[in-house]
Design a protein with these regions (language model features):
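Bacterial N-terminal signal peptides that target proteins for export
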Residues: 9-25
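Bacterial N-terminal signal peptides
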Residues: 22-34
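Sec/Tat signal peptide C-region and signal peptidase I cleavage site
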Residues: 35-40
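Acidic, serine/threonine-rich low-complexity disordered tracts
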Residues: 41-131, 176-272
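Surface-exposed beta-loop interaction hotspot
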Residues: 140-175
Length: 272
């Protein structure tokens, strides 16, 4: 369903929440949490991002391919624009656009996410902008539309759409806790713990390489975690594998792209 052509004075404010949580490449969560920031230090730049075009496969962990994707990235000075587009065989699309700066530390400047098609339970469009201090979240399902918009002050350690970039910049063996913004439909800050989870042997052609698995765990308070579990809204853990020899490189990430969604594997591939 398209959101176009709707007069501003007829927009509906959502009364029930849906959450959109993106992990670098990747998540949408539905949670109920107060807007309360326990701000941590932003992530330092160890490896600056540059121009890149990555080819991706989208599949199930069983090996079945369900789609393909592109990671398109450009850099202008210390400003980087990164776009992840996943195209599913059934015509569904996951499209997210991140703009960030990398002057000593990584800083999220703006973020947009769009999901549509039969692979997703609803059409979703989300945007955040640090400079204007604004957000907008829209969804459509079964002919019904919901929308929330307003002002938002983003802490320095908010990193929607940048998890893979952050993991590549962690020191060997280091863990970090950052924040992401989820929508219910009003914005809520969620703490995300990123922890190394062991070595992983990967193979490129016939060459074995050493990689590291990272666990990405949303952290809720005990009472909220229990409530979210009972209500079927508990955010799922994710896992990313990063090649950690010399200069880090993305290998794959496993996790759902929406609440209660299937675990999809997004991995690097090559042109043949």
């Amino acid at each position: 369903m398209s959101f176009a052509g709707r007069p501003p004075d007829t927009r509906k404010r959502a009364s029930q929440g849906i959450a959109f949580f993106r992990l670098g490449v990747l998540a949408a969560l539905m949670v109920l949490a107060p807007w309360a920031s326990v701000e941590a230090a932003p992530i330092e730049v160890r490896f600056a991002e540059g121009a890149a075009h990555g080819l991706l496969l989208v599949g199930l962990v069983s090996g079945e391919t369900v789609g393909h994707g592109d990671l398109l990235q450009t850099a202008h000075g210390d400003r980087v624009e990164s776009r992840l587009i996943l195209r599913f065989k059934d015509g569904s699309v996951h499209d997210e656009h991140v703009v960030f700066s990398q002057q000593r530390v990584f800083t999220l400047l703006s973020y947009r996410l769009m999901q549509r098609g039969p692979s997703f339970p609803e059409t979703v469009a989300v945007s955040l902008d640090r400079k204007t201090g604004s957000y907008n979240a829209r969804s459509a399902r079964d002919g019904k539309e919901q929308e929330s918009s307003g002002s938002i002050e983003l802490p320095a350690d908010v990193y929607n759409g940048m998890v893979v970039t952050l993991v590549k910049n962690l020191a060997p063996g280091a863990s970090e806790t950052v924040q992401v913004v989820a929508f219910t439909p009003k914005p809520r800050l969620i703490r995300l713990e990123v922890t190394p989870a062991g070595a992983q042997r990967v193979v490129a052609a016939d060459l074995a390489r050493q990689a590291t698995r990272y666990a990405l765990k949303p952290r809720l308070g005990a009472a909220l975690r229990l409530f979210a579990t009972v209500m079927g809204m508990a955010p799922a853990d994710q896992e990313c594998v990063i090649l950690t020899e010399d200069v880090p490189a993305f290998v794959r990430c496993d996790g759902p792209l929406y609440v209660k969604g299937p675990v999809w594997r997004i991995e690097q591939t090559v042109a043949r």
